[in-house]
Amino acid sequence: MRPSNRTPAQSRPVTITRQFTAHAEGSVLVEFGDTKVLCTASFEEGVPRFLKGQGQGWVTAEYGMLPRSTHSRMQREAARGKQSGRTQEIQRLIGRSLRAAVDMKLLGENTIVIDCDVIQADGGTRTAAITGACVALVDALNWARGKGILKTNPLKFLIAAVSVGIYKGEPICDLEYIEDSAAETDMNVVMTETGKIIEIQGTAEGEPFSHEELLSLLDLAKHGIREIVDIQKASLS
């Protein structure tokens, strides 16, 4: 039995609140249960130096956790003067995932900067961030089209993400912190709205997992992401 009494395939309640802040071109508060992440998308003219003159755009991401997003206060990384390896890994994952969803030629020489700030953490912050950031990205692209900056929508498809893992010997979907911290296997899966895989991050924290267990976890992820994409679409309608 899971601590929350959810079934193995059951995700936490997912809520997406658009236009959560006033200034960003795209702004979303995404909630996976008690995990809450603020995702903003900023539309900026120009591209990084390595892309100048190539007629294509760029999507990049930054990620951070507020000091009291966790049970005990964390020192701000800005105060330490250095980003952790975890932070760098997660923001690269978010950026890679979102770039897969955008036609960079249609974006033109423009950049979209995604900022994901974890307000409250209870497991699955990176998957929540990707899910919310995708909706913020859609709003930023629509803003640019409304301003006449973009003639064609560069979005190829929606993307979403969910965590899966093996907890007490059983494959489960959307791990909360108490499950994540005790899981034998932990995996994050990013997929398109049609179920195609963008990225899989999977690690055996305890016992190695079998090929059959891997397929079972991917099936759980596909089912969970399908439900999350439906919530994304409802929020955008």
Curated annotation (Swiss-Prot):
UniProt keyword Zinc present: no
PROSITE patterns: RIBONUCLEASE_PH
Binding site for phosphate: 86, 124-126
Catalytic activity: tRNA(n+1) + phosphate = tRNA(n) + a ribonucleoside 5'-diphosphate
Family (UniProt): Belongs to the RNase PH family.
Protein name: Ribonuclease PH
Annotated source species: Shewanella pealeana (strain ATCC 700345 / ANG-SQ1)
Enzyme class: transferase
Classification via InterPro entries: ExoRNase_PH_dom1 (IPR001247), ExoRNase_PH_dom2 (IPR015847), ExoRNase_PH_dom2_sf (IPR036345), PNPase/RNase_PH_dom_sf (IPR027408), Ribosomal_Su5_D2-typ_SF (IPR020568), RNase_PH (IPR050080), RNase_PH_bac-type (IPR002381), RNase_PH_CS (IPR018336)
Keyword Nucleotidyltransferase on entry: yes
Record-listed E.C. numbers: 2.7.7.56
Function: Phosphorolytic 3'-5' exoribonuclease that plays an important role in tRNA 3'-end maturation. Removes nucleotide residues following the 3'-CCA terminus of tRNAs; can also add nucleotides to the ends of RNA molecules by using nucleoside diphosphates as substrates, but this may not be physiologically important. Probably plays a role in initiation of 16S rRNA degradation (leading to ribosome degradation) during starvation.
Keywords attached to this entry: Nucleotidyltransferase, RNA-binding, rRNA processing, Transferase, tRNA processing, tRNA-binding
Gene Ontology biological process: rRNA catabolic process; rRNA processing; tRNA processing
GO molecular function, one term: 3'-5'-RNA exonuclease activity
Subunit structure: Homohexameric ring arranged as a trimer of dimers.
